Amino acid sequence: MFRRRPPLPPFPPGAALVGGAVRDWLRGVRSADYDWAHPDPAAGARALAALVGGAAFPLDEERGYWRVTAGEVQHDFVPLPPNLEDDLRRRDFTVNAIALREGRRLVDPLGGQQDLKRRVLRMVSEDNLRADPLRAWRAARFVTTLSFTLEPQTEQAVRQVAADLKAGRLPFPAWERVRDELHALLRSPDAARGILTLEALGLLDLTLPELREGQGLTQGGFHHLDVFEHGVEALHQLLTRRPDADLLLRWATLLHDVGKPRTFARDPDTGRRSFHGHDRVGAELTTQILTRLKLPGADVKRAAALVKAHMVQLPADDAQARRFVHRRRELLPDLLSLMLADREAARGPSSSELGRFAYMLAMERVLAALEEQPAAPPPLLSGKEVMALLGLTPGPRVGEVLRALAEARALGEVGTPQEARAFVQRWAEETPGS
C-alpha cells in the first residue's frame, strides 16, 4: 500500500524516534523533521550531530530540549520518559502514537500501524483530544494531507470539541497555533477538500466565519455555485493549474469573493443580483481575517491587494497590456492566476467556451507584455530634474509627473532623457495641477 521505506538517520544509543517521523517512515515518506526521546538529550544530540555532520545546540537546557540541524533536516531531542508506552498513550492519534527503537523495533501500544494500513485517523482517546482542542484542527489537517478517513467516533468527538469551543466550554487555542494548522492544510494539493472538511467538522465557523457567510448565497449569471462553494472551487482550480502557488495566493483565491455577502443587493424590478464594491470590502475582510490569524503585515497587505484587484478589466490590445503590467507589476503573475481560477470556477448560464477563450487571449497579452518587460525600467529623470524643468517645489505634483513619465516609458512612448523632458513639459501643460 505504501512506498518502500526510506533510510533512517543513525540512532544515537538509547534513543527512541517518536511522532510524525515514524508515521511517515512507515508510509514510505522521507521526513525533514525528526523527534527523538533520549535518556540524555544533550549527549544524544551531540552524538547524532557528529554522525550526520550537523550542529547541536540547546533549545531549553533546563528542560533538556536540544536540536540538531543538518542541511534541510532538523532533529529535536527531549528527555526519554520513564514509561515510553504511557507517553505514547497521551498523544493525539494512534498513527502518531508509535515509537521506533534501535534495530527498527516498533513500540505500538494502540494499533497505529493497523490504522495506517487502513488509512484511518483514530483518536487515542476523547480526553486526549479535549486536553488540547487544537487537535481538532489537526484532525482536519491529517485527513487532508494524508488522504485518510476519520474514524466515526473520532469524528463525533471532533464535532463535540468544536461545539464546546463555540459555547465557551473549552479554551480556544492561540491563533498562531490555529494558523499553523491551517497553513499545513492549505499547503496540501487537496486544500479545497480540506476547507470542506473544516466545514463538515464545525471548525470553519470558528476559524473563518466570514467565508461561511457565502453559503446559500446564489449568484446567477456566470456562476453555477453559491459564493462559498465558488471560493472553494476557485482554490481547487488554482491548485490544478499552479500546484506551486504560495500560501498568500492560496489565501487570496479562497477569500477573493468574501466581500460578496456584505455587498449583496437585488434590483426590485428585475430581480438581478449585484455585489458592487465586493472587491474593496473583500480586501478589508481579508485584512481582518489574516491579521486575526497573526500573519505578518506585509503578507496581509499583499493578499488583500490581490483580492482588491481581482475584478480589474483585462486589456483589449497590446498597449493596454503594457499599461496593465506597469500598474500592477508587483502583483503579477499571481493576480492572473487568481483571475483565471475565478473564471474557471464559474460555469453558469452566462459562461461560454468563447468567453473563456477570449479571456485567455487577454491573459496571454499580459503575459507577453510581462515577458517583454519583466522589471520596471530605470527612471529617465529624477525628481530634482522634474522640479527644475517645471519650476516646482517638493510636493504631490512632482510624484504625479514622475508616475506619468514612468507609465509613458513602460508603454514605449519615451525612451531617452530628451524625450522624457519633452513629455514632462507637454504633460504638465495638458494636465493642470490640483
From Swiss-Prot:
Reading the lineage from the top rank, the first entry is: Bacteria
Keyword annotations from UniProtKB, A to Z: ATP-binding, Magnesium, Metal-binding, Nucleotide-binding, Nucleotidyltransferase, RNA-binding, Transferase, tRNA processing, tRNA-binding
**Sequence positions that bind ATP:** 20-23, 91-92, 96, 132-141, 177
Annotated EC: 2.7.7.-
Instruction: Give the enzyme's main class according to its UniProt record, as a single word.
Output: transferase
Give all residue intervals belonging to the HD domain. 227-339
State any single GO MF term.
ATP binding
Task: Give a yes or no for keyword Endoplasmic reticulum in this entry.
Answer: no
Q: Which Pfam families match?
A: HD, PolyA_pol, PolyA_pol_RNAbd
Which cofactors are reported in the record for this sequence? Mg(2+)
Q: Where does Mg(2+) bind?
A: 33, 35
Gene Ontology BP annotations: tRNA 3'-terminal CCA addition; tRNA surveillance
Q: Which reaction does it catalyse?
A: a tRNA with a 3' CC end + ATP = a tRNA with a 3' CCA end + diphosphate
Q: What does this protein do?
A: tRNA nucleotidyltransferase involved in the synthesis of the tRNA CCA terminus. Adds the terminal adenosine residue to tRNA.
Family per similarity comment: Belongs to the tRNA nucleotidyltransferase/poly(A) polymerase family.
Q: What is this protein called?
A: A-adding tRNA nucleotidyltransferase
